[in-house]
From Swiss-Prot:
Cell division protein that may be involved in stabilizing or promoting the assembly of the division complex. It is a single-pass type II membrane protein. It holds the Pfam family POTRA_1. Residues 1-19 have a biased composition (Basic and acidic residues). This is Cell division protein DivIB. Residues 88-158 form the POTRA domain. Residues 1-20 are annotated as: Disordered. It comes from the Bacteria. It comes from Weissella koreensis (strain KACC 15510).
Amino acid sequence: MNEKNKNDESKHQEDKLQDQKMWNRINKFFSRSIGQSAKRAPKPKAISKSQSFRILNRFNAMERNSIHMIVILSIISLLLILLLSPLMRFQKVEITGNHDLTKAEVLAASGINKKIPAWQLLSEQHYFIQRAEKNSQIKKVKISYLNMQVAQIKIEENSKVGLVTKKDKNYYILADGKFIPAQSVGEKPQRLPNYEKFPNDKTIKRVAMQFNGISKALQNSVSEVIWSPDHEDDEKVILIMDDGNKVLIKASDIKNKLKYYPGMVAQIDKNGTFNFQVGTYFQQY
């Protein structure tokens, strides 16, 4: 009988010791989590094994959740570091399709530079395109990616087709008839025809849009575009050519007829006037 009592008492002491260890573990966890001293934890009371098991399972679940949270935060931190890393920035931005505009002017218009992270250019592409197209000289923009290190900006320009003087100030005439100030600081002079004697901006726009329909080489061979209507043709235009010739042509026919000029000049070795108004003929000076 005494031996049985001793065994029961020993088992009871072991259970109490296990409970004490469990409470010590819980107190230690809470003291780390909220700064509460383990000494201030409530004095443990005797609990059953099933209660101990439930508490231990709950505690283990809390530990697992804490570990999961730490892993998630670590992954997010790693992603942020990668996104902001120099490795995630384009090392080169190529510009194509520009003739009048320089590479620096295209980049400035779009707001794109090497400091912009690759993810930002990818996610906000529409914004950069809209910003670039606000420039009067940029008609269309396309952004593509050759690889994760090289981006390409392809533009279609609203080309300069001439020069005009308005109120003692010089302006470039763009292909759509808009005007922009000429000769900005540091800008190289361009070889463009001067538009003379035009009565209004609307008439200039009509001729400019026609002029944009011919080749760049042919555009560059014209030094002056003179509005010169008469009783026979109310939209007659005189073109003074760099080669010493003169061309008479209807404004609305510039795109369709002036393209034949180079072939005609090649067959004539003297200077004179080429008339494209009614039919086509040459009159020597």
